[in-house]
Amino acid sequence: MAMSKPEQPAHTGSGPLFERRYWVDVQHPRQPADALLRHIERHLPDFSSDLLADFEKSKGTEGRLAVGDEYSIKILGPWNGDVRVTEVGTDFFELTTLESHPEAGRIRFSLRPHATLSDTVRFEIHSWARSRDGLVAFTYDTLGLGRRVQQQTWEVFCQRVADFSGGLLLGPVQVETIKEGEEVD
């Protein structure tokens, strides 16, 4: 059995740290937030565009999500990488990038009741990452190639969650990026 790759936390990367949030609010979903999140966990690849980021479970039991599970992701362009499930909670799960992934960091998927609207949930993807190395930083951030693919990937993911919920989408997918040391854009 092959040894697992080591994790690649943000402090091992290169360039500025980016905090990114993608979220969507859905009113009157057909199922409770916890049931919807469990479905996402069991069917993670179904919510990602396989043209942009094709998730394939490489370690762990199919049909469930547990700490230690790993996914290989084929990303549009020369961006393939692996991630490991590092946390699973009642309303979230978190993935950490592994060695050779184009980014160094972590990403959290959460589904919670909306803070102010009744019978409404917020699905959010929240990442904290920097580029793996200077070359990735240049092509990803300076040229913007990887960044556009990534944004489209997570917007599609949010949209598919909203569609699957069967509820009313309250506006388009929202995107927020904070570059280390800068204000929200």
Each predicted region: which residue ranges?
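Hydrophobic-ligand binding "helix-grip"
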Residues: K74-D119
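Beta-strand/loop substructures that line and gate deep hydrophobic ligand-binding cavities in soluble
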Residues: S100-R148
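N-terminal leader/presequence segments that precede the conserved core
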Residues: I73-L76, G181-D185
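A conserved amphipathic terminal alpha-helix motif
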Residues: R130-V184
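Short amphipathic alpha-helical segments, especially helix-boundary/capping motifs
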Residues: G13-S14, V83-T86, G134-L135
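Hydrophobic ligand-binding cavity/cleft-lining segments
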Residues: M1-K74
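Intrinsic-disorder/low-complexity, polar/charged segments enriched in Ser/Thr/Lys/Arg/Asp/Glu/Gln
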Residues: L17-W23, F92, T120-R122
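Conserved short hydrophobic interaction patches
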Residues: H39, H43, F47, H101, ...
